[in-house]
Amino acid sequence: MWRSLGLALALCLLPLGGTESQDQSSLCKQPPAWSIRDQGPMLNSNGSVTVVALLQASUYLCILQASKLEDLRVKLKKEGYSNISHIVVNHQGISSRLKYTHLKNKVSEHIPVYQQEENQTDVWTLLNGSKDDFLIYDRCGRLVYHLGLPFSFLTFPYVEEAVKIAYCEKKCGYCSLTTLKDEDFCKSVSLATVDKTVEAPSPHYHHEHHHNHRHQHLGSSELSENQQPGAPDAPTHPAPPGLHHHHKHKGQHRQGHPENRDMPGSEDIQDLQKKLCRKRCINQLLCKLPKDSELAPRSCCCHCRHLIFEKTGSAITUQCKENLPSLCSUQGLRAEENITESCQURLPPPAUQISQQLIPTEASTSURUKNQAKKUEUPSN
């Protein structure tokens, strides 16, 4: 159920962050006109939800992203999200141009990969984009989301859920290009979501009960993206760069369509956040700490947000930059996942004990915390 309801906690917290280089006034507006070799990709996608990926052929991560983009396209189509256009725009640099074919071969013929010419106006600059950014537009070509790393990393569900939001929720108001078929599909998705919410088991609320007692300083059921429940005194940090969420400015002027009755204003942001926060992120780790640790709270959450992460098979390894207890026994939200959390030890190895909290210092040592372990295994310096 949590997978199907994965409008991820991260999407709930996105309004807290932004990309400094991103022009926030681009919310719910069409992008500047751009073309590549006399082709207008956005015009060709008119009437479809459009996903524009800014990938760099000379970058290994971008190549991985390209292959995962094809997987995402297939997955969305199987789930019924059929009216979606995917576009890849390669970097303008010479090294990327030389490896254009390699990038193109990583996706199917259903995803066009555009190569910018050397002397043309840089499309990335026009879109205020950076490497690995994903821009999601509605059927009328209005920008709904602009996601950057780490939130655009396709191992995690943020891009997928942002596409689904753009597909079925009128974030920028009514679009006259929405077909009856799409409207019927979105109604069925909404009804299915309501049914699954009603059938939700009680342990979900039991988990929230613990957080309500231990994290009342948060002020609501949603956690700050920077606060670890396992470290209640940890300082709050700004959102990581490379992320811009366009729900932050709902009150701005919209271009083209006057039907504003369906558009949430700034006064509805809290309701929107609460709605999204009721949905769980499959990448949230529930960390059960040893009972014999006096300083250890009952649970901590690693949201996989301020993280360096990788995915190997079905196991997700998170290397957290935040203050975390020196030992966590972690389990994923899905039973079939076997997740090991890799904490970041900030104390010398002798101090890496089960009963001590991590304290930030200039010294940093990798520390792998294993399930049911008796102590934190820290390599010697």
From Swiss-Prot:
Residues 202-268, 352-381 are annotated as: Disordered. GO terms for biological process: selenium compound metabolic process. Residues 1-19 form the signal peptide. Keywords: Glycoprotein, Phosphoprotein, Secreted, Selenium, Selenocysteine, Signal. Might be responsible for some of the extracellular antioxidant defense properties of selenium or might be involved in the transport of selenium. May supply selenium to tissues such as brain and testis. The C-terminus is not required for endocytic uptake in the proximal tubule epithelium. Belongs to the selenoprotein P family. This is Selenoprotein P.
